């Protein structure tokens, strides 16, 4: 939610000041908030600083992704995003195991110290290696920001493809949000067993991204999505089967979510590229619009399903995942097929 509040400003700001300056400022702000959270003594101040951390974190979605799409050629940009996804997955993959160890043996403070240190190192990496923008964008009055956003939001292809992104990403987000409750409280797994259960699920996403990198040059752009989404639908159906036969739920949910994460791995970066390139407006503004829509959707849908989970428990999770993927097969799938047909007519692979 914190990231969504400022992402809309960061994109247009990076169009005017340059991607590098805004990224460096965002990373520095994130490091500072990670260190300040060590001084908190109650849950209220802790949550305020977590909210502020979202400000710095949002520069990746609102500015960093736009910089990647502009710097690299089409398929290379998709490969870079897939590679970034694999690197960022180390946090939720290793985090539960390391976090359980820190809480049991040391203190939660060390987790934020480590995060601040790694972010501090990334600041120097960006400073040294990120290319500065050489082409200048004409500076328009600030009133044009609103006009640009209106142009983006009135683009039906953009809206359809962008709103399809949370449908694809949400089941895994729900897994990350609710798996501690499902596995530890509902099924009685230990903290270590819970951490180990994340490996096949998030490992599926890593494998999917690797497969995408390997095959993206051989298939028409978008083909991996048409392969990945049916796999995701199958995965969510397996989770529903696990709810019906409760004694097999643990095996079904891990198998099903592994298929879901693999399908997301071979699909999401391609869908993001199509969403970002569906508008002719400056990519900082478009990326910011994508980021804001996705973050608010994540926030509200996760909260809605959390409330449903309190009443319907595992059924709420399983049916929500299935419904989200099934929804993608409506308008977003039709738009994807249209884009692929248009690319074929234009002689684009």
Summary of predicted features, one role per range:
Residues 18, 39-45, 56, 73, ...:
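Helix-breaking motifs and short loop linkers at transmembrane-helix boundaries and internal kinks
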């Amino acid at each position: 939610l914190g990231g969504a509040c400022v992402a809309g400003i960061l994109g247009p700001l990076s169009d005017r000041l340059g991607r590098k300056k805004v990224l460096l400022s965002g990373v520095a702000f994130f490091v500072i908030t990670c260190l300040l959270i060590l001084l908190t003594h109650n849950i209220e101040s802790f949550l305020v600083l977590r909210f502020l951390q979202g400000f710095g974190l949002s520069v990746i979605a609102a500015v960093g992704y736009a910089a990647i799409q502009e710097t690299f050629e089409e398929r290379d940009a998709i490969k870079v995003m897939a590679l970034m996804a694999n690197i960022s997955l180390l946090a939720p993959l290793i985090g539960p195991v390391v976090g359980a160890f820190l809480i049991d043996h040391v203190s939660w403070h060390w987790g934020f110290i480590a995060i601040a240190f790694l972010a501090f190192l990334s600041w120097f990496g960006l400073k040294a290696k990120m290319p500065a923008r050489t082409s200048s964008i004409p500076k328009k009055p600030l009133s044009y920001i609103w006009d640009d956003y209106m142009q983006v939001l009135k683009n039906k292809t953009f809206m359809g493809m962008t709103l399809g992104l949370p449908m694809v990403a949400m089941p895994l987000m729900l897994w990350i949000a609710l798996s501690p409750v499902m596995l530890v409280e509902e099924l009685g797994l230990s903290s270590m067993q819970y951490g180990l259960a994340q490996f096949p699920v998030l490992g599926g996403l890593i494998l999917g991204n690797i497969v995408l990198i390997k095959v993206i040059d051989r298939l028409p752009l978008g083909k991996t999505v048409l392969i990945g989404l049916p796999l995701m639908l199958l995965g969510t159906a397996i989770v529903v089967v696990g709810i019906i036969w409760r004694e097999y739920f643990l095996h079904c949910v891990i198998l099903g979510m592994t298929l879901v994460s693999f399908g997301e791995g071979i699909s999401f970066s391609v869908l993001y590229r199509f969403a970002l390139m569906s508008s002719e407006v400056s990519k900082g503004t478009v990326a910011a619009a994508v980021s804001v829509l996705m973050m608010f959707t994540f926030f509200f849908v996760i909260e809605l399903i959390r409330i449903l989970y309190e009443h319907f428990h595992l059924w709420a999770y399983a049916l929500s995942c299935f419904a989200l993927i099934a929804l993608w097969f409506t308008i977003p799938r039709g738009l994807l097929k249209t884009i692929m047909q248009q690319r074929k007519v234009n002689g684009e692979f």
